[in-house]
Amino acid sequence: MSSTSEPTYQLAPPDSLKQVYLTLAAGFAVGLGIFLLRTNTLPHTGDNIHHLPHGGCYRDGTKSIRYNSPGVATSSNIFLPAVAVLCILALLHVPFFQPDRVRRRCCRFYWCADPHHPTV
């Protein structure tokens, strides 16, 4: 047996961690991109053979299906929810724009603007 001395290598930290972080960021970005491109958020319609995720109709001898595409409003009143929210907000703010005498009379809480209250 002859003993040959093999060189010993020691691991040393990299001079800069910039390359490590850049590689991790690139891998994360690629993984996130693949995940987002493969995710299907459309509703499942149809059966195990016929899928209509973008809307359409199918009919054969025993069954028929009709599905409107997502994103198409079925109602002509698409502004009705927005108008309802604005009306509710307006009704909630009406008491704040009335004179103080009306507000004092209908307010029952201790923080009302009452001139006879000792904190005012």
UniProtKB/Swiss-Prot annotation:
Keywords for the protein's UniProt record, in alphabetical order: Host endoplasmic reticulum, Host membrane, Membrane, Transmembrane, Transmembrane helix
Record Pfam families: Plant_vir_prot
Intervals, Lumenal compartment: 38-76
Transmembrane segments: 17-37, 77-97
Main location: host cell
Superkingdom of the source species: Viruses
InterPro entries: Plant_vir_prot
Subcellular location: Host endoplasmic reticulum membrane
Segments in the Cytoplasmic topological domain: 1-16, 98-120
One Gene Ontology term, aspect cellular component: membrane
Protein task: Plays a role in viral cell-to-cell propagation, by facilitating genome transport to neighboring plant cells through plasmosdesmata,.
Miscellaneous field: TGBp1, TGBp2 and TGBp3 seem to act together for cell-to-cell propagation. TGBp1 is the main movement protein that physically cross the plasmodesma with the viral genome. TGBp2 and TGBp3 would facilitate TGBp1 function.
Similarity annotation: Belongs to the Tymovirales TGBp2 protein family.
Protein name: Movement protein TGB2
Organism (species): Lolium latent virus (isolate Lolium/USA/US1/-) (LoLV)
